[in-house]
Every structure is written in C-alpha cells, then in structure tokens.
A protein has these predicted regions:
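N-terminal anchoring/stem segment of glycosyltransferases
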Residues: 1-68, 80-82, 86-87
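Membrane-proximal basic amphipathic "stem/tether" segments
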Residues: 8, 116, 210-256
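Short beta-strand-to-loop acidic/aromatic patch adjacent to the donor-nucleotide binding site
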Residues: 86-96
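Conserved donor-nucleotide/metal-binding helix-loop-beta segment in metal-dependent transferases, i.e.
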Residues: 99-125
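Short, flexible, basic/aromatic active-site loop/helix in glycosyltransferases
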Residues: 127-135, 149
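Catalytic core and acceptor-binding pocket of nucleotide-sugar-dependent glycosyltransferases
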Residues: 138-201
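PAPS-dependent sulfotransferase catalytic core
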Residues: 179-229
C-alpha cells in the first residue's frame, strides 16, 4: 500500500500526563531525529493542552487534552474516541528512540497486522509468545493495535497496571482475530523511566545523543525502589510468568 495512505491507516498515540511533561522534550527531540519521515500522525494525550493552554501541539502533530481527574485508561479511551484510523501505534512517553526507525519495515508490520485482522501486533518479544488470556497477552510495549479493540480494553480497566494484568485475561475466545508478536524487537527504543525515576539506560541515551535535561527535576531512583525493582525482576526470572501474574492479580500485588 502506498505511503501516502499510511496516515489513513494508523495513528501514533503517545500516552502522557502533566506530571511527565518534562519528558516530552527529549521524547520529541529523539523522535524527530530518528523517525523524521514517520508517515503517521503523532498524537499525545494528557490532561492539559499546549503551552498556550489550548490546542498548541508543543511539537506533536496534535494534543488531546482530557482535563483533570481521569485515570490512565480513561484518558486513553478519551483519546481513542478522537482518532479515526483503524490501527493505533501506542507508545508511552518515556519510550525514547535510540536509533533510526525503518519506515518501510514499520509499514510492512502494519500490513501484516491488517492482513491478519490482528487485535495487536507487539513489537517486543518479551514474552516471546502471544497467547490470549495468558500473562502479558496485553502489554503497553510498542505495538500496533486495532483501535476499537484497544478502546474496549481501556473502557474496562483503570490504570496501566490493570490494563496489562487484568486486560490480558479479557479476551473473547470465540473471537478468531489473533494477537501477534514479532520474532525480534522491531521498534528501537529505550524504556527510559521506571516509577517516575530515570533508568541508567535512559540517562546514557540522553548523554550519547547530546540531549539536554535538568536532572534536578527527576533523577535516578533511591536505594529502596531500585532494590524492589531488582527483586521483582528476580521473581520473574525464577518463577513462571503465568503463575506470578495470576498471584499478583488475585492479591493486587505489585500495582503501579
């Protein structure tokens, strides 16, 4: 399909919030540097509008301003209701591009999702399988989503945590449309923040790319949050993901 039709097929939706607006400048600087020929509209969702308090996009093609008081999922649904393309590439605003995006390859992957009528094509094989009603069948990792399906998930959950943990078990088994995952990581980004703190990889990326940032605004995590994160990684490394996630869901453990 011709590139000029790409903007009718898919929209990039960046989930943000006013508390994380300081991340948008490095996000956009790296986006324009590493994907200058992105064929899709770049839309951000957050509580407030542009710098003028209204519709200014602040470097995005469009900002959807929800107003205060909505949960993460409610903000996601609000934005999706204002997008018309059948597919959405959903990203978090701390997913910072670390190398050039291959536009032709992205269009191939979108075509693969369209040809299969896929509900989701996840571009990070972690976990390596895509199985409905299993751990991380739904993930905030970079991927192409059927917009209507994504909207349905957003309306049934509240937080990003619920979206992943509970949404993974909300599939209708009678729906033949697949969920898919690529064999290798196909979208080149660093997950730069964790629980509001910079990850070392994110700091290193900014320094390598010469992107300025005032780290007095937010820095690296203190000892205890870092220890908790490392312990969680160890649990997932030792025990089956399915077991861990089901226990978390039953007892509301690890909620973000």
């Amino acid at each position: 399909m011709a590139d000029q039709n790409a903007s009718d097929r898919c929209t990039v939706l960046v989930t943000s919030c006013d508390r994380y607006r300081d991340i948008e400048a490095p996000f956009l600087a790296l986006w324009r540097r590493h994907w200058p020929d992105c064929p899709f509209e770049l839309v951000a969702v957050r509580e407030s509008g542009g710098d003028d308090g209204g519709t200014a996009a602040d470097g995005f093609d469009r900002v959807v301003a929800t107003g205060p008081g909505l949960s993460w999922s409610e903000m996601l649904a609000f934005a999706l209701e204002r997008i018309s393309t059948p597919y959405v590439l959903m990203l978090m605003n701390d997913y910072l591009l670390d190398s050039r995006v291959d536009t032709a390859r992205q269009l191939e992957l979108l075509s693969r999702a369209e040809a299969a009528d896929a509900l989701n094509l996840r571009m990070n094989p972690n976990p390596p399988r895509a199985v409905k009603n299993s751990a991380y069948a739904v993930s905030c990792q970079a991927g192409y989503w059927n917009r209507e399906f994504l909207l349905g998930l957003a309306r049934r959950t509240k937080s990003a945590w619920e979206f992943e943990r509970y949404g993974s078990y909300m599939f209708d088994e009678s729906d033949p449309r697949p969920i898919m995952v690529t064999e290798r990581k196909e979208f080149p980004f660093v997950d730069a923040l964790h629980k509001g703190y910079w990850e070392p990889e994110g700091v290193a990326l900014l320094k390598r790319e010469g992107i300025g940032y005032d780290f007095s605004r937010r820095g690296l995590p203190p000892f205890w949050p870092r220890l908790k994160s490392n312990l969680k990684k160890a649990v997932f490394a030792v025990f089956p993901w399915e077991l861990v996630v089901r226990v978390q869901n039953v007892f509301n453990l690890g909620m973000k």
